[in-house]
Swiss-Prot record:
A zinc finger (C3H1-type) spans 89-116. This is Zinc finger CCCH domain-containing protein 62. InterPro entries: G-protein_beta_WD-40_rep (IPR020472), WD40/YVTN_repeat-like_dom_sf (IPR015943), WD40_repeat_CS (IPR019775), WD40_repeat_dom_sf (IPR036322), WD40_rpt (IPR001680), WDR86-like (IPR044715), Znf_CCCH (IPR000571), Znf_CCCH_sf (IPR036855). GO terms for molecular function: DNA binding; zinc ion binding.
């Protein structure tokens, strides 16, 4: 499908495309909804405690309201190779022959014949279509369409009712990242961001000033869109509500990283950015100034997550670090967890059935460790044939994983199970 269309130029570096592929995705138009709040399912928000207290002592309340749960890819369940759950503590590794469909031992096998060993966690769909590493998965709020992008240069749209791919769009470029906030979907491309609204079919091309390279990571905070690039710059757009045709205004560029920006997290009034330069920078969301640089990792920082009053980071150096504020307001490492002989590629967090916080940690060997917070006691594991490169939390117990082979899996954590 060719997504190109006639352009109409606006100020502030925004290009609108008329009758673009967002029109194909949405069958009917809905009243325009301005962007005025973050998506409560964003993985970059503080998702555990009901109230977050910033270093300055300001309380950050959470909302407990939830949106209606979308259908969970019902017809795709036939693709889910979920074997019976093994509860034995000795069976912590999936059988490599079973993964290839060649194990002859059956129930007598000493290894797991399941893609997970966490009570209540089940894989409900395996979506096949991409043939290279997934760079992002997004389920827009209120939508029954799931979006995924890959370095194979395609954007795929999946119907949540049937589990079928309803659109495969050739981007003519390698995708770098994908997120959703409210009704908006943001796609990171070389030197630009494509934004479209699933409710109104509005389709925009946010053009960066100059050559900044691939957009590797994005997040939204305080009504601003932040985009981390391969040049080390962080581009900032401000969301506006005064014009339906020009909802995002280019604001500035944050400089400081000497290598590619790889990940973001938001906690309180702070933006955290990780980079190939092995550092984490802390930016004040009110002034957009860098107020601290953290240098404890010895490899690329791959993922960041805010939990309660802490920052959690992962790296290709094989460590997961927990950072907390000291009495003088400095972030310091209070815990380091090392994964022997395996780098750490992605982090994500959610609550279990008892509303206890758990964290998912993806390792290079295709395993995802599931741990309690703050103890980091292991609770279970997920498995894949390749490294899981992206983990995205959805509404009401949904979890999406995408690996380096292009396989996209949908998981659900059953409510009410005792864990």
């Amino acid at each position: 499908m060719d997504y190109k269309a006639p352009r109409r130029y606006y100020s502030h570096g925004v290009v609108a495309r008329q009758q673009d592929f967002a029109t194909d995705i949405v069958t009917r138009r809905r009243p325009y909804v301005p962007y005025d709040r973050p998506n409560k399912f964003s993985r970059s928000l503080v998702w555990t405690s009901k109230e977050y207290k910033s270093p300055e002592g300001n309380n950050m309340p959470r909302t407990n309201d939830v949106s209606p749960k979308p259908p969970v890819l019902g017809l795709a369940r036939k693709n889910a190779a979920c074997g019976p759950m093994r509860s034995s503590s000795l069976r912590k590794w999936v059988c490599k022959y079973w993964k290839d469909g060649k194990c002859k031992r059956g129930e007598q096998c000493q290894f797991l014949h399941s893609w997970s060993c966490f009570p209540g966690l089940a894989m409900v769909a395996s979506l096949e279509g991409h043939n290279k590493e997934l760079k992002g998965i997004a389920l827009p709020e209120g939508s029954d369409k799931l979006f995924s992008v890959s370095i194979d240069g395609t954007l795929r749209v999946w119907d949540c009712n049937s589990g079928q791919c309803v659109h495969s769009i050739n981007l003519d470029a390698e995708a770098g990242s994908l997120i959703s906030e409210g009704p908006w979907v943001f796609l990171g491309l070389p030197n630009a961001i494509k934004a479209f609204n699933v409710q109104t079919s509005q389709d925009l091309h946010l053009q960066a000033a100059g050559v900044v390279g691939q957009v590797n990571a994005m997040t939204i905070a305080n009504g601003m869109l932040f985009a981390g690039t391969s040049s080390g710059s962080i581009l900032v757009w401000k969301a506006t509500t005064d014009s339906e045709s020009d909802p995002f205004k280019y604001l500035t560029s944050l400089e400081g990283h000497s290598g590619e920006v790889t990940c973001f997290a938001v906690g309180g009034q702070m933006l955290y950015s990780g980079s190939v330069d092995k550092t984490i920078k802390m930016w004040d969301l009110n002034t957009l100034q860098c107020i601290m640089t953290l240098k404890q990792h010895t490899g690329t920082v791959t993922s960041l997550l805010c939990w309660d009053k802490c920052l959690i980071s992962s790296s290709l150096d094989g460590t997961i670090k927990v950072w907390a504020y000291s009495e003088n307001g400095i972030l310091k490492v209070v815990q380091t967890r090392r994964q022997e002989q395996s780098s750490v590629h992605a982090l994500s967090g959610m609550h279990d059935a008892e509303a206890k916080p758990i964290i998912f940690c993806s390792y290079q060997n295709g395993t995802v460790g599931i741990f309690d917070l703050p103890s980091f006691q292991e609770r279970g594991r997920m498995f894949s044939t390749h490294t899981i490169a992206t983990l995205t939390i959805g509404p009401q117990g949904l979890l999406f994983s995408g690996d380096e082979s292009g396989n996209l899996r949908v998981w659900t954590l059953a409510a009410g199970n005792k864990v």
